[in-house]
Amino acid sequence: MKAIILENPEHFTTANIDEPNQPRAGEALVEVSRVGICGTDVAGYLGKMPFYTYPVIPGHELGVTVLSMGEGVENVKVGDRCSVEPYMNCGECFACCKGATNCCESLEVIGVHKDGGMCERFVLPARKLHPSEKLTMEQLALVETLAIGCNCVNRARPGEGDKVLVIGAGPIG
């Protein structure tokens, strides 16, 4: 199976890697169709992301298709086109139990701390897949980026008629 590997800052390689294992209970095997490239990927490539783990297969903004599932998976089925929630949280620590999964004590981001989607296929927890019958693969790959903006609005809770100042010249804003 083909993959792109960021060996260390400013050094990509292409490689043939082993096929992923069959999914275990609660997991899904997906085929990658689209990968978004964002500021995190650029910073990782430039060596300016202090928590990047090298070598790594980048890619966390993904449009994928479900190929198979392990036991107990109910949120997706074979053939579903999905966006991927790339933040792998434990679900058990204090932060996760309070709903602050982004503050998980064991947080790992695919494509940053662990291998991501710049490969043909990979296995991940099925709970991190969000199916859509309407969005294109290109749109599915951008859902993660949209979610960041939506979370900002949700946290700020602006009301009708409120003035909002958006500061930032980054790729997401």
Protein language model annotation of sequence segments:
Residues P20-V35, K48-F94, E133-L135:
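Glycine-rich beta-strand-centered segment in the early N-terminal region that forms part
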Residues E7, E19-P20, T53-G59, I110-K114, ...:
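Short Gly/Pro-enriched turn/cap motifs at secondary-structure boundaries
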Residues K2, E27-L29, K163:
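Residues that mark the start of a beta-strand
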Residues G173:
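N-terminal Rossmann-fold NAD(P) dinucleotide-binding loop
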Residues N8-E10, R24:
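Residue-level recognition of beta-strand termini and adjacent short loop/turns
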Residues C90-I167:
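NAD(P)H dinucleotide-binding glycine-rich loop of Rossmann-like/cofactor-binding domains
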Residues T40-A43:
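Cytochrome P450 core scaffold surrounding the K-helix E-X-X-R motif
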